[in-house]
């Protein structure tokens, strides 16, 4: 379907001056500062030797790339068919599905106690791979949805900029950990406090900028699609890595990397490809998708943290039981003079080789 033959649904129009207001500029600057701080903090948790190991044995990276560019685009395409979405709706979802992994995956991997070295390597490789995979996937899956040429709309400069904003602060963090480790706790604490404060500012500015415009994309089928896509990524990423027998830490990492998409790139493509009168409220679909990414990611973190609190209690019960059994046996052994102070007492009357004292005497 040609873009110029499609009209914006709901007679939608963007807020006046959208994208050029002072609040828009402030939001963009804050998001950049947040990303740099997060990547710097995450770099302080990484080790160069472990990063190099993931390149020498790239099993986890390959699985993640397959999950990212195999599962997510196919899921987006199938969901568009299942929910009978319009051409523009299906295209907006497909662009999100073909985007590389987002930087939020690194932060959520840290919260899920995943492999941070693998996470950063995966994000970097995913972005590099996007330079070729995004135009190819958009060309393949958009056939029958959109008659225009999407492969020329891929924001290559945006992808390269996102790589720079990941690699440079991470490299600084790795340097600090290896050469100035005494600074690392201060960097992590300051980064956490500043990031939390900026998150509040981002929330307030986003509400001011978008207002009630996002309500236009909260239709039942778009809500269902934007909730199922990240969930599918989280679930299938974990299952795929489990099938290849990766350790639990790597499974959680690949799960987060697969489920989180770079919605900023999706917004850029939609903005470049379609004028507002064509894309209409679907301009805000990436924001809706990001909300569900965050909500589902936080839900998985809560479930995982609850699991960690329950699991040690079971282990502690076993330890306490064994300790109690040893304590009950010790007084009796002391009375008989058979306790040596280190090992649990043996059965009375038996020597270590299984013969009683009478048999030994004979």
From Swiss-Prot:
Family: Belongs to the bile acid:sodium symporter (BASS) (TC 2.A.28) family.
Post-translational modification Phosphothreonine, affected residues: 330
Taxonomic source organism: Mus musculus (Mouse)
MF (Gene Ontology): bile acid:sodium symporter activity
Keyword vocabulary terms for this entry: Cell membrane, Glycoprotein, Ion transport, Lipid transport, Membrane, Phosphoprotein, Sodium, Sodium transport, Symport, Transmembrane, Transmembrane helix, Transport
Name of this protein: Hepatic sodium/bile acid cotransporter
Catalytic reaction(s) noted: estrone 3-sulfate(out) + 2 Na(+)(out) = estrone 3-sulfate(in) + 2 Na(+)(in); cholate(out) + 2 Na(+)(out) = cholate(in) + 2 Na(+)(in); taurochenodeoxycholate(out) + 2 Na(+)(out) = taurochenodeoxycholate(in) + 2 Na(+)(in); tauroursodeoxycholate(out) + 2 Na(+)(out) = tauroursodeoxycholate(in) + 2 Na(+)(in)
Primary gene name: Slc10a1
Reported function: As a major transporter of conjugated bile salts from plasma into the hepatocyte, it plays a key role in the enterohepatic circulation of bile salts necessary for the solubilization and absorption of dietary fat and fat-soluble vitamins. It is strictly dependent on the extracellular presence of sodium. It exhibits broad substrate specificity and transports various bile acids, such as taurocholate, cholate, as well as non-bile acid organic compounds, such as estrone sulfate.
Composition skew (Polar residues), residue ranges: 339-362
Cellular component terms per the entry's GO annotation: basolateral plasma membrane; membrane
A Pfam family matched in the record: SBF
Keyword rRNA-binding attributed: no
Region (Disordered): 332-362
Parts of the chain that traverse the membrane: 23-44, 48-83, 87-112, 116-142, 157-179, 184-217, 220-243, 248-273, 281-311
Regulation: The transport of bile acids is sodium-dependent.
